[in-house]
Amino acid sequence: MADIDFPAELRALRALRATYDSIERVIDADSLRKDIAVLSEQAGVPDLWDNPAEAQKVTSKLSHAQSKLERLETLTARIDDLEVLVELAESEHDEDSLAEASKELVSLQKSLQELEVVTLLAGEYDEREAVVTIRSGAGGVDAADFAEMLLRMYLRWAERHGYPTSVLDTSYAEEAGLKSATFEVKAPYAFGTLSVEAGTHRLVRISPFDNQGRRQTSFAAVEVIPLIEQTDSIEIPDNDIRVDVFRSSGPGGQSVNTTDSAVRLTHLPTGTVVSMQNEKSQLQNRAAATRVLQSRLLLLKKQQEDAEKKALAGDVKASWGDQMRSYVLNPYQMVKDLRTEHEVGNTSGVLDGDIDDFIDAGIRWRANNRNAAE
């Protein structure tokens, strides 16, 4: 490409192409196409669905591979088109074309950044869907309110990305907010993406529940686990589980159901407890609770086999220790990740789901730590 009058845009475009080329080498489009061909052939076998678990595994892998290749090919076309647009701006000294190219350049940089982060999601479970549990910690009613704020933040984040979610369980506090909430994010790489959110979150603000208007510090814990697939072999003997049924409850402990549709499963050997109440029937709640319990037990099993996986669930005590992010609303406004040092002053935006930069920084921080440990 000849020299042009817009050197800043040209340098940015060259850097963009270099970044893309490095990502393409990591993802390896040719290898992806071969995988897709093999998986497509397997998916076309007439008796595949005689084994539903194997069929789900094949179709899930095929969908993930096709999605990754589609993103790569779309970016290829967009970068090629941008290069043509920049050449047009150069040859005709067209400022309108330059403005259009500059806008597309910014959009492409963001798309490339997102794809680059995907290349860092290479953990055993990173491609899985995720189950997220938020629990209020120290701080009384403010902590319960904070837990509800975090639930909204993550649901808004998923909505921004078009990721389907399902709230599986909510346990309301007496005065306001939530004791705990569990929801599922049904998207590829949801676990790898959200697992960096696991840990203790801290809120500092003037309490709306304090008549004297004092500043209050409160905490909530976020746990993230990969959702089990039918191909994972986790058999739980019936005598290892205690089943309790009760009526679903709403804010303030008010019953929202006239039947005992809510289900609590307790895995006696490990003490793991899972409650579900948001489905319409006891049968549906039990099925959802069983799947989440299996997911937690699978993760526990893997953690026992490999001590390095202890950090996967991020099941921590929500108090002063082990904090990963602070949300300060008073006396100043700042959200800061204590691991990556990433911080922003737009607290309302963050609490409305604008957390991509925090997640990206967390994934890069985790990848750097893994590389340093190797």
Swiss-Prot record:
<dbReference type="Pfam" id="PF00472">
    <property type="entry name" value="RF-1"/>
</dbReference>
<dbReference type="GO" id="GO:0016149">
    <property type="term" value="F:translation release factor activity, codon specific"/>
</dbReference>
<dbReference type="InterPro" id="IPR004374">
    <property type="entry name" value="PrfB"/>
</dbReference>
<dbReference type="InterPro" id="IPR045853">
    <property type="entry name" value="Pep_chain_release_fac_I_sf"/>
</dbReference>
<protein>
    <recommendedName>
        <fullName>Peptide chain release factor 2</fullName>
    </recommendedName>
</protein>
<dbReference type="InterPro" id="IPR005139">
    <property type="entry name" value="PCRF"/>
</dbReference>
<comment type="function">
    <text>Peptide chain release factor 2 directs the termination of translation in response to the peptide chain termination codons UGA and UAA.</text>
</comment>
<keyword id="KW-0488">Methylation</keyword>
<dbReference type="Pfam" id="PF03462">
    <property type="entry name" value="PCRF"/>
</dbReference>
<dbReference type="InterPro" id="IPR000352">
    <property type="entry name" value="Pep_chain_release_fac_I"/>
</dbReference>
<feature type="modified residue" description="N5-methylglutamine">
    <location>
        <position position="254"/>
    </location>
</feature>
<keyword id="KW-0648">Protein biosynthesis</keyword>
<keyword id="KW-0963">Cytoplasm</keyword>
<comment type="similarity">
    <text>Belongs to the prokaryotic/mitochondrial release factor family.</text>
</comment>
<dbReference type="GO" id="GO:0005737">
    <property type="term" value="C:cytoplasm"/>
</dbReference>
